[in-house]
């Protein structure tokens, strides 16, 4: 099993925490949720393929994490993270 590696822009991470109340360190934990749902995000995939992951964080919050894969797919770049809306929460398995 390969180890997950993460990266993000520190300024974006700080702005995200202020706006949405979600730290990217917490958002990382969604990637180990075995029930998380991966969703393609073609509307935001101009320069690179972007995805949204809906899953539980280590703080037991249902989060939506926008991300892309870098390198040869072994680095996950977190773009944004926020609490899932009630409507989005219904899509969690």
Spans of features found by a protein language model:
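Ribonuclease/tRNase effector modules and their secretory precursors
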Residues: 1-93
């Amino acid at each position: 099993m390969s180890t997950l590696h993460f990266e993000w822009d520190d300024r974006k991470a700080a702005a995200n925490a202020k706006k949405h109340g979600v730290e990217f360190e917490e958002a990382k934990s969604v990637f180990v949720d075995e029930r998380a749902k991966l969703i393609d995000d073609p509307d935001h995939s101009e320069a690179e393929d972007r995805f949204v992951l809906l899953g539980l964080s280590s703080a037991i919050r249902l989060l939506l994490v926008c991300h892309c894969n870098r390198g040869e797919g072994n680095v996950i770049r977190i773009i944004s993270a926020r609490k899932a809306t009630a409507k989005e929460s219904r899509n969690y398995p």
